[in-house]
């Protein structure tokens, strides 16, 4: 009886010969039972972009741990690199007509499909419930923070941030004197968008040519406390706000490449976003500026009020 036949009868996987692992065969077998692709420098699954490969490494370890092989951590790293080749697809364009949610996909025409049958770029960690009541606490918070005519503008901008598209060609700046509670908007959006939102700095984006690459695959970048210094350069910021499709991205120590860019910019500030040298209409025309109401005299502040905690935990599903 051949060695391979003995292994089959022992229910040993074909990628293990009893002594060593055939990494290419392992990847082929692994990918046969899982939905995963590698595109644009990242792994994607039905749950969206893989932002932390530790769970993936854990799955691989569960397959390997019964095989007596040396240096399993290095073996797993090798398998991850081979998987990038085995699961590679040339491109994975964003889908601008739908929002992928925890319990299905909502099309922009209002139709909803349950489940996660397809691999997607972004999946938001909130549920779509068409019969959910109005988010009363959220609306009350907005009524106390913004003027009535500005609330629909904020709501539309938030809706705009749910799809991977920069067609609106606008960023938003919400300014106030401080202490109004405007940064709670960022906390709520973080609950809605999950790993599709990133904390960042408008100043860093304007100065650092590598900062744009950090926004690849991201739906929204929030600057929670925008610096008041006027921007020396505005071209990087404007290029993100007006991006249509792919743009040139660069990471430190690596050759530049073409990557999809659809990150929107939202900043909270005590003043206007100014440019030191750019006096063109284009820079200021791209900004939606909202001014908060004055902080009520005698209001007692709580850095993490129970009501806002409840809002972030229970009402984020109701925005949709």
Tell me the role of every PLM-derived stretch.
Residues 220-241, 277-282:
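Conserved AAA+/SF3 P-loop NTPase catalytic/coupling segment centered on the Walker-B
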Residues 200-205, 235-255, 303:
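Substrate-gripping "pore-loop 1 plus following alpha2 helix"
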Residues 53-105:
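Long, basic/Gly/Ser/Thr-rich N-terminal segments
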Residues 280-293:
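A short helix-turn-beta junction within AAA+ P-loop NTPase domains corresponding to the substrate/partner-engaging
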Residues 31-58, 95, 99-100, 105-219, ...:
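P-loop NTPase catalytic core of nucleic-acid-dependent motor ATPases
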Residues 309-316:
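Conserved small/polar residues in nucleotide/adenosyl-binding loops
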Residues 210-216, 249-268:
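AAA+/SF3 P-loop NTPase mechanochemical coupling elements
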Residues 225-226, 263, 267-272, 293-294:
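A short beta-strand-to-loop transition that corresponds to the Sensor-1 phosphate-sensing loop
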């Amino acid at each position: 009886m051949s060695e391979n036949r003995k292994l089959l009868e022992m229910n040993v996987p074909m990628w293990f010969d009893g002594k060593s692992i055939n990494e290419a065969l392992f990847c082929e077998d692994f990918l046969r039972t899982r939905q995963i692709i590698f595109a644009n420098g990242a792994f994607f699954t039905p749950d969206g972009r893989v932002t932390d490969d530790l769970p993936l490494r854990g799955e691989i370890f569960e397959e390997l741990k019964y095989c007596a092989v040396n240096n399993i951590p290095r073996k797993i790293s090798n398998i991850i690199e081979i998987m990038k080749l085995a699961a590679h697809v040339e491109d994975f364009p964003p889908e601008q007509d739908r929002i992928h949610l925890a319990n299905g996909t909502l099309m922009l025409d209002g139709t909803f499909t349950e489940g996660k049958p397809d691999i997607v770029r972004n999946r938001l960690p909130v549920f779509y419930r068409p019969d959910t009541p109005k988010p009363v606490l959220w609306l009350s918070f907005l009524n106390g923070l913004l003027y009535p005519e500005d609330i629909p503008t904020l709501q539309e901008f938030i809706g705009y941030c749910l799809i991977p598209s920069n067609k609106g060609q606008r960023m938003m700046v919400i300014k106030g004197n401080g202490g109004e509670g405007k940064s709670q908007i960022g906390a709520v959006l973080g609950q809605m968008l999950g790993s599709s939102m990133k904390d960042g700095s408008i100043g860093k984006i304007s100065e650092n040519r590598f900062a744009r690459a950090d926004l690849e695959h991201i739906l929204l970048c929030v600057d929670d406390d925008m610096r008041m210094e006027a921007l020396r350069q505005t071209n990087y910021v404007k290029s993100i706000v007006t991006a249509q499709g792919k743009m040139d991205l660069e990471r430190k120590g690596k050759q530049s490449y073409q990557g999809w860019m659809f990150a929107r910019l939202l900043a909270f500030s005590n003043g206007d976003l100014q440019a030191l040298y750019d006096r063109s209409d284009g820079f200021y025309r791209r900004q939606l500026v909202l001014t908060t109401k004055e902080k009520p005299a005698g209001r007692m502040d709580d850095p993490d009020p129970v009501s806002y905690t409840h809002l972030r935990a229970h009402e984020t599903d109701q925005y949709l």
